């Protein structure tokens, strides 16, 4: 599954380090079909991840393709803001490390016209959706269902993420930084939607600001607004300790935090145990025994 979508990227990264990877260039004739290819690949990746996970009894929601949920099943908007805030901070920190250590990067065409901008936007969307769905959600949930330990899951997921960013050379260390934070956020909430959104806008902003510099200013203000929203939501939940804490989706068998063995982390099993306990308690009360 991973090789189907990322093997070519690993090879391209190696060619980039060797100085042999050609810079993509052209107009609508080249970038138009490439844009369609990126969007098609995105849809296929999500469909395959959902279908293969369903064969293992993991629903799309359990996989993480849904917003963060609170204990009552409602959408946890505050959790989403804080996830995005932490993800953005991780990308900034990781990006700084990569910038300091990188020995190479993917080339870009000298003329960045509308055709290239559209392609870059589609590629950014594909990166956010495909990477977080395959490299994060699908890989982590599969390893957890296989009974692998937390260190094994984290190491494998980070290694997969670093592999197709090999064109940075030593700068790939920065990728490991934000990849680790993304894994923590996913395990903590059981959702990848905020991570997809942040990843898309991070990559997209890098491309857009090269053509429209004012987008960088807008991105800064949006980042500040996100931080404020995250802090306000944290303060609001902290001031109301009586409210149930935000958690992952109730059906997240293999992704909800804390890390546990798959058999013990199945909420449906816990629910059945509680039901049996209540039934036994009622039987004892009917016979005059203490419940």
Mark where each language-model region is:
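Membrane-helix interface segments
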Residues: 59, 71, 116, 147-152, ...
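Functionally important transmembrane alpha-helices
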Residues: 8, 12-15, 170-229, 233
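Juxtamembrane helix-loop-helix connectors linking adjacent transmembrane helices
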Residues: 18-36, 58-133, 140-146, 240-245, ...
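Alpha-helical transmembrane segments in multi-pass membrane proteins
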Residues: 1-57
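Aromatic-anchored segments of alpha-helical transmembrane domains
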Residues: 3-11, 91-99, 158-167, 200-209
């Amino acid at each position: 599954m991973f090789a189907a979508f990322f093997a070519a990227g690993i090879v391209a990264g190696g060619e980039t380090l060797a100085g042999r990877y050609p810079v993509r260039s052209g107009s609508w004739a080249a970038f138009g079909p490439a844009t369609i290819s990126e969007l098609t690949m995105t849809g296929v990746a999500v469909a395959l991840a959902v279908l293969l996970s369903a064969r293992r009894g993991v629903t799309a929601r359990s996989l993480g393709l849904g917003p963060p949920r609170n204990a009552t099943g409602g959408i946890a908007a505050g959790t989403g803001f804080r996830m995005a805030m932490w993800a953005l901070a991780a990308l900034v920190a990781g990006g700084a490390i990569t910038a300091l250590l990188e020995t190479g990067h993917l080339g870009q065409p000298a003329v960045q016209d509308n055709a290239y901008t559209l392609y870059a936007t589609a590629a950014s969307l594909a990166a956010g959706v495909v990477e977080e769905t395959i490299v994060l959600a699908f890989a982590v949930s599969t390893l957890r269902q296989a009974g692998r330990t937390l260190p094994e899951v984290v190491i494998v997921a980070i290694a997969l993420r670093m592999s197709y960013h090999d064109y940075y050379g030593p700068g790939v260390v920065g990728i490991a930084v934000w990849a680790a934070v993304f894994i923590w956020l996913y395990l903590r909430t059981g959702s990848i939607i905020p991570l997809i959104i942040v990843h898309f806008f991070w990559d997209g902003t890098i491309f857009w600001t090269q053509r429209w510099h004012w987008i960088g200013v807008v991105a800064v203000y949006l980042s500040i607004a996100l931080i404020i929203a995250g802090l306000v939501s944290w303060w609001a939940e902290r001031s109301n300790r009586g409210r149930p804490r935000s958690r992952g989706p109730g059906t997240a068998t293999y992704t909800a935090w804390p890390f546990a063995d798959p058999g013990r982390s199945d909420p449906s099993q816990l629910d059945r145990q509680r039901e049996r306990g209540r039934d036994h308690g009622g039987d004892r009360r009917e016979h005059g025994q203490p419940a």
